[in-house]
UniProtKB/Swiss-Prot annotation:
The chain crosses the membrane at residues 373-393. Residues 36-372 are lumenal. This is Glycosylated lysosomal membrane protein. InterPro entries: NCU-G1. Residues 394-406 are cytoplasmic. A motif (Lysosomal targeting motif) lies at residues 402-406. Required to protect lysosomal transporter MFSD1 from lysosomal proteolysis and for MFSD1 lysosomal localization. Pfam families: NCU-G1. GO terms for biological process: positive regulation of transcription by RNA polymerase II; protein localization to lysosome; protein stabilization. GO terms for cellular component: cytosol; lysosomal membrane; lysosome; membrane; nucleus. It comes from the Eukaryota. The keyword Membrane applies. Highly N-glycosylated. N-glycosylation is essential for GLMP stability and for MFSD1 lysosomal localization. The gene is GLMP.
Length: 406
């Protein structure tokens, strides 16, 4: 099943200055992003001709001289493989016999191989839960006592084809534990909604991350699951591929502008290598109600990345199939909420979103509201100085024209 749409690609608000724009253009040249004005975006569920349908979603964004591939799958834990090529003709090749075997190496390829400019992956390995009862925000371990985590490799997922929406370029992976003796997910689910975009814009709901045709958005929602404590905090364990012996870098950006995400002045980024390369971008906020707003905002904390042994993590067949078995993994945790304030316990709802992309991460310019406030704040003193100068000038002129009668 497939849906496609022409989408405009451009810097838009991503360029704070002409000098920075030229710098970005020069460095983007190796990635084949020069001159990209449009991208043809398509979503396709790759069929398994050998047996039951498997959830393998391919997002393909084709430009004049480049292609971006995002391959999502719930085979094992939910994962995405990101690939950027310098040709509009690169294709995804899937060998289902290999992919579903105990040794899936080579079961997933982007061809031609020599066109690949960047590739990496994210794997959402575990759903975490902590008991924050009687824990203060100033405690040494403010998250509280951990419950046994839910391995996402042991989840049962919906048929992704049923949720594929070509009109919005979106699809949703929705799952629950296969073994749930306490029935904590009897009326609940964990959902990962993936969406590609036809142009640079913002969603209507917070945190309103600026996106382009070079990005796709992931919205994670925990809905209706029964917490194991009265004030449970939830989180996600996330694994990614290291760059050689090193882990990707985590950066924080701060702003004076919070119009798009009220009371949130920070943007977090995960960067694979030096720019331009791949990135993940999110605001450190989650929401305990739908739609999200200031009153339901929860803090989102990201732990430092650390090297992780592959055998200690739930394994993703698509990551193994594309990258092989000899890889350095790094992991970090995202946790949502605090022991005080709003939380999942309010409505048994939690949502958080991030952007994934290739190239330079979108950069927020100042919103029209903030620009207006700054113009007034900076313009008023200037007008007062100008007015004062005119008064002094006219006053001086009046006295200079006075002639003594003597």
């Amino acid at each position: 099943m497939r849906g496609s749409v022409e989408c405009t690609w451009g810097w838009g608000h991503c360029a704070p200055s002409p000098l920075l724009l030229w710098t970005l253009l020069l460095f983007a040249a190796p990635f084949g992003l020069l001159g990209e004005k449009t991208r043809q975006v398509s979503l396709e569920v790759i069929p398994n001709w050998l047996g039951p349908l498997q959830n393998l979603l391919h997002i393909r964004a084709v430009g004049t001289n480049s292609t971006l591939h995002y391959v999502w799958s719930s085979l094992g834990p939910l994962a995405v493989v990101m690939v950027a090529t310098n040709t509009p003709h690169s294709t995804l090749s899937v060998n289902w016999s290999l992919l579903l075997s105990p040794e899936p190496d080579g079961g997933l390829m982007v061809l031609p191989k020599d066109s690949i400019q960047f590739s990496s992956a994210l794997v959402f390995t575990r759903l975490l839960e902590f008991d924050s009862t009687n824990v203060s925000d100033t405690a040494a371990k403010p998250l509280g006592r951990p419950y046994p985590p839910y391995s996402l490799a042991d989840f049962s997922w919906n048929n992704i084809t049923d949720s594929l929406d070509p009109a919005t370029l979106s699809a949703t992976f929705q799952g629950h534990p296969m073994n749930d003796p306490t029935r904590t997910f009897a009326n609940g689910s964990l959902a990962f909604r993936v969406q590609a975009f036809s142009r640079s814009s913002r969603p209507a709901q917070p945190p309103r991350l600026l996106h382009t045709a070079d990005t796709c958005q992931l919205e994670v929602a925990l809905i209706g699951a029964s917490p194991r404590g009265n004030r449970s905090l939830f989180g996600l364990e996330v694994a990614t591929l290291g760059q050689g012996p090193d882990c990707p870098s985590m950066q924080e950006q701060h702003s004076i502008d919070d119009e798009y995400a009220p009371a949130v002045f920070q943007l977090d980024q995960l960067l694979w290598g030096s720019l331009p390369s791949g990135f993940a971008q999110w605001r450190p906020v989650a929401y305990s109600q739908k739609p999200g707003g200031r009153e339901s905002a929860l803090p989102c904390q990201a732990s430092p990345l650390h090297p992780a042994l592959a055998y200690s993590l739930p394994q993703s067949p698509i990551v193994r199939a594309f990258f092989g078995s000899q890889n350095n993994f790094c992991a970090f945790n995202l946790t949502f909420g605090a022991s005080t304030g709003p939380g999942y316990w309010d409505q048994h709802y939690l949502s958080w979103s991030m952007l994934l992309g290739v190239g330079f991460p979108p950069v927020d310019g100042l919103s029209p509201l903030v620009l207006g406030i700054m113009a007034v704040a900076l313009g008023a003193p200037g007008l007062m100085l100008l007015g004062g100068g005119l008064v002094l000038l006219l006053h001086h002129k009046k006295y200079s024209e006075y002639q003594s009668i003597n």
